[in-house]
C-alpha cells in the first residue's frame, strides 16, 4: 500500500511546486555588481574571435583565445612615444 501512495504523493508535490511563483529578490539588498555588456569595438572583436575559434573546430585544435582587456588593442608603448617627442623639441 505504501508503494501505491508514493506516486500519488509525488504527483501532488509536483503539481504544488508548479503552481508556486518565485518571489523576486529586491535589488536594494543585492550588493553584487552586475557585469555590463560591452559595446565597444574591442569587445566586439573579442566576441568575434571567441565565436570564430569555437566555430572552426574542424580546422584544427580549438584553442581558446587569450583573455585580453580593452586596453590591449592599439596600445602604444609610452617610453617610445616620449623619446620620439623629445627629438623634435627645440633646446
From Swiss-Prot:
<feature type="modified residue" description="Tyrosine amide">
    <location>
        <position position="73"/>
    </location>
</feature>
<dbReference type="GO" id="GO:0042802">
    <property type="term" value="F:identical protein binding"/>
</dbReference>
<comment type="subunit">
    <text>Can form homodimers. Interacts with IDE and INS. Interaction with INS inhibits homodimerization and fibril formation.</text>
</comment>
<dbReference type="GO" id="GO:0150060">
    <property type="term" value="P:amylin receptor 2 signaling pathway"/>
</dbReference>
<dbReference type="InterPro" id="IPR018360">
    <property type="entry name" value="Calcitonin_CS"/>
</dbReference>
<comment type="function">
    <text>Amylin/IAPP is a glucoregulatory peptide hormone that plays an important role in the regulation of energy homeostasis. Selectively inhibits insulin-stimulated glucose utilization and glycogen deposition in muscle, while not affecting adipocyte glucose metabolism. IAPP function is mediated by the CALCR-RAMPs (AMYRs) receptor complexes. Amylin can also bind CALCR receptor in the absence of RAMPs, although it is more selective for AMYRs.</text>
</comment>
<keyword id="KW-0372">Hormone</keyword>
<keyword id="KW-0165">Cleavage on pair of basic residues</keyword>
<dbReference type="Pfam" id="PF00214">
    <property type="entry name" value="Calc_CGRP_IAPP"/>
</dbReference>
<keyword id="KW-0732">Signal</keyword>
<dbReference type="GO" id="GO:0045779">
    <property type="term" value="P:negative regulation of bone resorption"/>
</dbReference>
<protein>
    <recommendedName>
        <fullName>Islet amyloid polypeptide</fullName>
    </recommendedName>
</protein>
<dbReference type="GO" id="GO:0043025">
    <property type="term" value="C:neuronal cell body"/>
</dbReference>
<keyword id="KW-0964">Secreted</keyword>
<keyword id="KW-0034">Amyloid</keyword>
<dbReference type="GO" id="GO:0141163">
    <property type="term" value="P:positive regulation of cAMP/PKA signal transduction"/>
</dbReference>
<dbReference type="GO" id="GO:0005179">
    <property type="term" value="F:hormone activity"/>
</dbReference>
<dbReference type="InterPro" id="IPR021116">
    <property type="entry name" value="Calcitonin/adrenomedullin"/>
</dbReference>
<dbReference type="GO" id="GO:0150061">
    <property type="term" value="P:amylin receptor 3 signaling pathway"/>
</dbReference>
<feature type="propeptide">
    <location>
        <begin position="77"/>
        <end position="91"/>
    </location>
</feature>
<dbReference type="InterPro" id="IPR021117">
    <property type="entry name" value="Calcitonin-like"/>
</dbReference>
<keyword id="KW-0027">Amidation</keyword>
<dbReference type="GO" id="GO:0005615">
    <property type="term" value="C:extracellular space"/>
</dbReference>
<dbReference type="GO" id="GO:0030316">
    <property type="term" value="P:osteoclast differentiation"/>
</dbReference>
<dbReference type="GO" id="GO:0045671">
    <property type="term" value="P:negative regulation of osteoclast differentiation"/>
</dbReference>
<dbReference type="InterPro" id="IPR001693">
    <property type="entry name" value="Calcitonin_peptide-like"/>
</dbReference>
<dbReference type="GO" id="GO:0050850">
    <property type="term" value="P:positive regulation of calcium-mediated signaling"/>
</dbReference>
<dbReference type="GO" id="GO:0097647">
    <property type="term" value="P:amylin receptor signaling pathway"/>
</dbReference>
<keyword id="KW-1015">Disulfide bond</keyword>
<dbReference type="GO" id="GO:0045453">
    <property type="term" value="P:bone resorption"/>
</dbReference>
<feature type="propeptide">
    <location>
        <begin position="23"/>
        <end position="34"/>
    </location>
</feature>
<dbReference type="InterPro" id="IPR000443">
    <property type="entry name" value="IAPP"/>
</dbReference>
<dbReference type="GO" id="GO:0048018">
    <property type="term" value="F:receptor ligand activity"/>
</dbReference>
<dbReference type="GO" id="GO:0150059">
    <property type="term" value="P:amylin receptor 1 signaling pathway"/>
</dbReference>
<feature type="signal peptide">
    <location>
        <begin position="1"/>
        <end position="22"/>
    </location>
</feature>
<comment type="similarity">
    <text>Belongs to the calcitonin family.</text>
</comment>
<dbReference type="GO" id="GO:0019233">
    <property type="term" value="P:sensory perception of pain"/>
</dbReference>
<feature type="disulfide bond">
    <location>
        <begin position="38"/>
        <end position="43"/>
    </location>
</feature>
Amino acid at each position: 500500500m505504501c508503494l501505491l501512495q508514493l506516486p500519488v504523493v509525488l504527483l501532488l508535490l509536483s503539481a504544488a511546486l508548479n503552481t508556486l511563483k518565485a518571489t523576486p529578490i529586491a535589488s536594494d539588498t543585492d550588493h553584487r555588481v552586475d557585469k555590463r555588456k560591452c559595446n565597444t569595438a574591442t569587445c566586439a572583436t573579442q566576441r568575434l574571435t571567441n565565436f570564430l575559434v569555437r566555430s572552426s573546430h574542424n580546422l584544427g585544435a580549438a584553442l581558446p583565445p587569450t583573455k585580453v582587456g580593452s586596453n590591449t588593442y592599439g596600445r602604444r608603448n609610452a617610453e617610445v612615444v616620449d623619446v620620439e617627442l623629445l627629438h623634435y623639441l627645440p633646446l
